[in-house]
Amino acid sequence: MNHYLRAIGSMLILVYSMLTAFLFIDKVFVNIIYFQGMFYTQIFGIPVFLFLNLVIILLCIIVGSILAYKINQQNQWIKSQIEHAIEGETVGINDQNIELYNETIDLYQTLVPLNQELHRLRMKTQNLTNENYNMNDVKVKKIIENERQRLARELHDSVSQQLFAASMMLSAIKETKLEAPLDQQIPVLEKMVQESQLEMRALLLHLRPLGLKDKSLGEGIKDLVIDLQKKVPMKVIHDIQDFKVPKGIEDHLFRITQEAISNTLRHSNGTKVTVELFNQQDYLLLRIQDNGKGFNVDEKLEQSYGLKNMRERALEIGATFHIVSLPDSGTRIEVKAPLNREDDNNDD
């Protein structure tokens, strides 16, 4: 709206300035026509002087509105290009076939190298991540991984087995005739044990995550989903495209997927989780979505170790990390990681 007002105001000032200059310069026009004719001659019952002013104002409004609309189109297009650049997507797409002004094209041509530089920095971040993946910190990660494996084994051999035994005992007790209030308490206890088993499986997934080993990212996620479908009551759906992704990036994305699913199993109280992986040419899209209870993103993002860990992993590979969640509306996590197009071309 501000663009319209500025354009209309500018046109009015310009036209009136030209008209005033013309009237002052041409004294003959002022004496003969302006005073003698315009006040006495009428058009549609309106003095010519007033009619001409109304026509000029109307023309200014029409022309100014058209110009303001076109300028607003240019600004919106540039804004969309900047947003594409920030997200790591291709710039220069003109879906609405807008006629671009020379100034807009000049600004776009300035934006292109900035987008290329941003993409280069993202890829450099990925390369550094791949290099760090094979450096000395792998030893530290190995020590931590071994400790996590040890804790996971102990939990599986002790607590997990005890929960399973308790579940079997409760199932057997349910088959017998019980008097009140035991007949009402046993189902409650059984539900609590089942929830504890689900929590334990999520914790074991967090402590002892499956590794990709020689698998691709797509294959690893599919195997993870198939394994979960056998062990958890929640419905797990996947839509996975299998394509080449650098090893260091694959590992980070796989860990993000595991962390997101683990959080879903432990906290969402949902009945379904969907895992999607797509190749969008310039970038890949990883999406994990559930139909659970949701949460306040601003509060949880600072408090939850899991969410912060996922965001940090995404930033390490130059990816964007977005969470959309509302109470009673589920949660959606999206990770967009740029793909190295030059490497893909070389592989071809």
UniProtKB/Swiss-Prot annotation:
Record Gene3D superfamilies: 1.20.5.1930, Histidine kinase-like ATPase, C-terminal domain (3.30.565.10)
Topological type in the membrane: Multi-pass membrane protein
Catalytic class of the enzyme: transferase
Subcellular location: Cell membrane
UniProtKB keywords: ATP-binding, Cell membrane, Kinase, Membrane, Nucleotide-binding, Phosphoprotein, Transferase, Transmembrane, Transmembrane helix, Two-component regulatory system
Domain spans labelled Histidine kinase: 150-341
Gene Ontology annotations for the cellular component aspect, listed alphabetically: plasma membrane
One Pfam family linked to the record: HATPase_c
Chief location of this protein within or outside the cell: membrane
Disulfide bond positions: none
Reactions accelerated catalytically: ATP + protein L-histidine = ADP + protein N-phospho-L-histidine
Molecular function via GO: ATP binding; phosphorelay sensor kinase activity; protein dimerization activity
UniProt-listed Enzyme Commission number(s): 2.7.13.3
Transmembrane annotation, as ranges: 13-33, 43-63
Function of the molecule: Member of the two-component regulatory system VraS/VraR involved in the control of the cell wall peptidoglycan biosynthesis. Probably activates VraR by phosphorylation.
Name listed for the protein in its UniProt record: Sensor protein VraS
Source organism of this protein record: Staphylococcus haemolyticus (strain JCSC1435)
